[in-house]
Design a protein with these regions (language model features):
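Positively charged, small/polar-rich N-terminal and surface patches that mediate targeting and assembly
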Residues: 1-112
Length: 112
């Protein structure tokens, strides 16, 4: 089992969710985050003054999936979230040692 964590642009959430649902991914966690990558933010003009915006609003999506699905999940996220512009985001994959569904006590893949 793996956790696939993606940092994406907020307006891409629905497309990413639809792509994951089409793969049979039933649950995901979405967190509003701020950050920057290679672009290191940008500047904005407000009332004639220029301001540096260092941290950009993003969404962090986390999904727990069977190891066999990781490649398909990554492809689905990239396809749905990609704009071709700076700041499209990143995807990270980490192992899950164990998973437990609190309500039923199901473990590991049965819990997903």
């Amino acid at each position: 089992m793996k956790i696939v964590m993606a940092i994406i642009k907020p307006f891409k959430l629905e497309e990413v969710r639809d792509a994951l649902t089409a793969l049979g991914v039933h649950g995901l966690t979405v967190t509003e985050v701020k950050g920057y990558g290679r672009q290191k933010g940008h500047t904005e003009i407000y009332r004639g003054a220029e301001y540096a915006v260092s941290f950009l609003p993003k969404l962090k999506i986390e999904v727990a999936v069977a190891t066999e699905l990781v490649g398909q999940v990554i492809e689905a996220i990239v396809s749905a979230a990609k704009t071709g512009q700076i700041g499209d985001g990143m995807i990270f994959v980490t192992p899950i040692e164990t998973a437990v569904r609190i309500r039923t006590g199901e473990k590991d893949l049965d819990a997903l």
